[in-house]
């Protein structure tokens, strides 16, 4: 039997370097990168790099040999090789100026088909929905790009079309759950088929070209190439699940004969689709969304009243209320407000929305409409205002969605300082410190309790000040009365004018008899109490907890745990302890900042009230002088 040589088995055969993979596949580096992105193959980090690299200490890019064998059987490899042949032949035709043959070759340009790869990577529809976050974020980003060197106009237009179709599904299904505005853009979260899908829509700023190539647009465009196919399949399935026609179409009532529609019907329809303000054509006339919700609630009611079922019932009721949050409300968006995010929100929750027709196509009513209930404004003042509507800032819409109720509009009027816009994407179990404003998102009743506690603390402080003044006056009066009483007592010998030193001899006998009777009664009561104590349960003593001893016991237990950790797990244990300590330190710092901030605010309110009282007292005194 032949003895196996070193690096012929084990970890050395499980990995292959990138150079060896290129030789095996007979591809260039760019084609190999493209193939790996499309197939979802990525580099691996071995446990023992020196063994995996067959004794070499040089750091190389390594892949699993199984992954490279998997790529060998891919049909795209042949298409990528055909690109080389196509480039050589087309360059030859250009060199000899055979334009007829060149035109024929360009018509037969080899195209990569990615349908089978999408089906291979996502065997079920739920798998595709789980991986939809990055897909949507990247496509929404590319939909805002102009035509660049490595990003053709067709690609950005395709991204725009697919993202608009997805937004139409979100509006029609009313599956939006959370929203948030940040520096990066608008965060949206929808619940589709039980899966939470989160994506970012960037802010609408003019594109600024970069002087340096910091971002590799070529690699990103390869991802976009795959994600467009994936989102196309997903949209098709989602639209047919709601019985909507795909590609999106309008009913005949929207396509009325007008000058715009008669000139170019395709552009007219595409503009109205991009407006997100019209209902799409359905393949059936009955809407089954509400019926499905009722069926689910009936199924929940059939089960037992366990905690999980009760929680699911509450969540289902909240979601049903959220779906009709803006029902019956009419909004008008001003020019300075970003249109698309607000249209998505308002229409997803049953509201009606419009804007100035000169901004974008698809407005349904003008600003002068008397039935408008809310006008969204993002400027310090406005010239003409209607009494029949509320003029609010855009944050009101986002906060209403996150708190799942219509908030009062007085804090969001024009020119008002807005309340903090808190993120709903916070895990209360994972994050140790949660500010009171964020707790109010989970429980709106905490807003009132927090405000009441602040008011109560201020009232208590005022009462304490008033009581302190009254107590000083009372002490002074009591001291004066005590001095007068002692003076009279010394002068007249007692309250009735009788001196205590003069005593009657008859009273001594009566006092002795009374003392004997009291002693007998005391003995009887003592006996009764002893008998009761024997029969009754005695009250327990209060056990005082020594915090120092408890802390010492915890420290000793922690040291014992650290000793018992295995040597190979010791670094991991230290890392976990370090993370825990940093988290506790951050929590302590945040609580300290919060305490100092609240103390400063409280002191500022107190000083403001004192100054107001002084001013009021001075004004009253001045008025009384003038009256005299």
Curated annotation (Swiss-Prot):
GO terms for cellular component: nucleolus; nucleoplasm; PeBoW complex; preribosome, large subunit precursor. InterPro entries: BRCT_dom, BRCT_dom_sf, PES. The keyword Transcription regulation does not apply. Keywords: Coiled coil, Nucleus, Phosphoprotein, Ribosome biogenesis, rRNA processing. Residues 454-470, 498-522 have a biased composition (Acidic residues). It is found in: Nucleus, Nucleolus; Nucleus, Nucleoplasm. The modification Phosphoserine is found at residues 453, 457. Residues 321-414 form the BRCT domain. Residues 523-534, 551-560, 597-616 have a biased composition (Basic and acidic residues). Disulfide bonds: none annotated. GO terms for molecular function: ribonucleoprotein complex binding; RNA binding. Residues 617-628 have a biased composition (Low complexity). Residues 438-470, 488-567, 593-628 are annotated as: Disordered. Transmembrane segments: none annotated. One of its GO terms (biological process) is maturation of LSU-rRNA from tricistronic rRNA transcript (SSU-rRNA, 5.8S rRNA, LSU-rRNA). Residues 541-550 have a biased composition (Basic residues). It comes from the Eukaryota. Residues 590-626 form a coiled coil. Required for maturation of ribosomal RNAs and formation of the large ribosomal subunit. Belongs to the pescadillo family. This is Pescadillo homolog. It comes from Drosophila yakuba (Fruit fly).
């Amino acid at each position: 039997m032949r003895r196996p040589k070193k690096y012929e088995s084990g970890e050395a055969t499980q990995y292959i370097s990138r150079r060896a993979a290129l030789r095996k596949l007979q591809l260039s580096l760019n084609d190999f990168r493209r193939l790996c992105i499309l197939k979802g193959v990525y580099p691996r980090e071995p446990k023992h790099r020196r063994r995996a690299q067959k004794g070499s200490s040089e750091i190389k890019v390594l892949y699993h040999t199984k992954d490279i064998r998997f790529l060998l059987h891919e049909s795209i490899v042949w298409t990528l090789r055909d690109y080389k042949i196509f480039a050589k032949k087309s360059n030859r035709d250009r060199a000899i100026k055979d334009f007829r043959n060149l035109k024929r070759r360009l018509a037969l340009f080899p195209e990569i088909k990615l349908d089978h790869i999408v089906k291979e990577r996502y065997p079920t529809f739920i798998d595709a929905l789980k991986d939809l976050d990055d897909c949507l974020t990247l496509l929404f980003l590319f939909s805002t790009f102009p035509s660049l060197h490595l990003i053709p106009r067709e690609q950005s237009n395709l991204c725009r079309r697919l993202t608009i179709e997805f937004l139409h599904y979100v509006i029609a299904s009313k599956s939006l759950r959370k929203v948030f505005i940040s520096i990066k853009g608008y965060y949206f979260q929808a619940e589709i088929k039980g899966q939470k899908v989160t994506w970012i829509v960037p802010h609408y700023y003019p594109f600024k070209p970069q002087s340096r190539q910091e971002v590799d647009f070529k690699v990103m465009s390869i991802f976009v190439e795959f994600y467009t196919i994936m989102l196309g399949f997903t949209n098709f399935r989602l639209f047919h699940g709601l019985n909507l026609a795909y590609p999106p179409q309008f009913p005949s009532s929207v396509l009325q004969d007008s000058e715009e529609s008669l000139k170019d019907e395709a552009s007219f329809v595409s503009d109205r689709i991009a407006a997100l303000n019209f209902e799409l054509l359905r393949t059936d006339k009955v809407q089954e969304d509400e019926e499905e919700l009722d069926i689910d609630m009936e199924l929940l009611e059939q089960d037992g009243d366990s905690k999980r079922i009760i929680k699911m019932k509450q969540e289902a009721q909240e979601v049903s209320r959220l779906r009709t949050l803006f029902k019956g409300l009419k909004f008008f968006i001003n020019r300075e407000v970003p249109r698309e995010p607000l249209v998505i929100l308002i229409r997803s929750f049953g509201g009606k929305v419009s804007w100035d027709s000169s901004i974008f196509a698809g407005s349904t009513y003008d600003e002068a409409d008397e039935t408008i209930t809310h006008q969204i404004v993002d400027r310090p003042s406005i010239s003409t205002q209607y009494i029949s509507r509320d003029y609010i800032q855009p944050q009101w819409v986002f906060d209403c969605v996150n708190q799942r109720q219509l908030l009062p509009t007085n804090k969001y009027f024009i020119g008002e300082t807005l309340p903090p816009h808190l993120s709903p994407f916070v895990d209360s179990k994972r994050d140790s410190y949660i500010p009171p404003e964020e707790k109010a998102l989970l429980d709106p009743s905490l807003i009132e309790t927090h405000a009441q506690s602040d008011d109560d603390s201020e009232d208590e402080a005022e009462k304490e000040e008033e009581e302190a003044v009254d107590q000083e006056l009372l002490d002074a009066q009591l001291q004066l009365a005590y001095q007068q009483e002692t003076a009279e007592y010394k002068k007249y010998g007692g309250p009735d004018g009788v001196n205590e030193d003069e005593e009657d001899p008859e009273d001594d006998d009566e006092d002795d008899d009374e003392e004997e009777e009291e002693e007998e009664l005391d003995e009887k009561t003592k006996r009764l109490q002893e008998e009761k104590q024997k029969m009754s349960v005695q009250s327990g003593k209060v056990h005082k907890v020594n915090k120092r001893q408890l802390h010492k016991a915890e420290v000793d237990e922690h040291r014992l745990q650290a000793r018992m950790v295995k040597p190979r797990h010791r670094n991991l244990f230290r890392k976990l302890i370090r993370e825990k300590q940093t988290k506790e330190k951050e929590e302590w710092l945040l609580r300290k900042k919060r305490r100092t901030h609240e103390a400063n605010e409280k002191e500022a309110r107190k000083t403001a009230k004192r100054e107001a009282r002084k001013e009021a007292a001075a004004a009253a005194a001045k008025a009384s002088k003038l009256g005299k």
